[in-house]
Amino acid sequence: FIQGHAPEVRSRWCTNEKTAMEAALGMSYAGKRALVCMKHVGMNVAADAFVNSAITGVNGGLVVLAADDPSMHSSQNEQDSRFYGKFAMIPILEPSTQQEAYDMMKYAYALSEEKKLPVLLRVVTRLAHSRAGVVVNDLMPQNALNPDQERTHWVLLPAIARRQYASLVAKQPELVESSENSPYNGMNAFEGKAKLGVIACGIAYNYVMENDPQSLGIPVLKVSQYPLPEAS
């Protein structure tokens, strides 16, 4: 489908999720944007390359889309891929609607290129196996090949890895600040005080809003970007 409608975009299947992650990472090192898609169990296979990509950093935007399967509709287990993102110390996004899934992808690439880190975008079965009309935007122009001339940080020898890891740790306050300013995190309009509130994310936020919590006097905090915002 992609090759038929956008032949300038290269897409392919890989032997497994680890090789897919490595291929996408290689394109990112060369300056191109890349997307790698897998299920939650595939994150186990890709874990080595995935975690190390946070330490090497990226050049062109790199987004990892992980589809989790709560209740095991078509999987051998349940996993929460957000723990992989937390362990790797990279930004995580979780859309609550089809429109948000579309919009978040562009945002994810911008965030990846700004922070020079891969971004994990997590979806779940009930969102992935659904349809909805979405408002589309103009296509992003492709970025040209632009290999980084300083390539030592792509090689994770211990001396380099220690330096890169320290850089990743130092970026964490920036990532928290980004979450605090994210258009996808925020409190629903609510006046007055309440004894009960709801914190929701992803498709669960949709389920909460279907019950019109505002009419019940219940404020709802929506959190769709991690690390968790810390400002009150």
Task: Label every PLM stretch briefly.
Residues 1-98, 103-105, 124-126, 191-192, ...:
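Thiamine diphosphate
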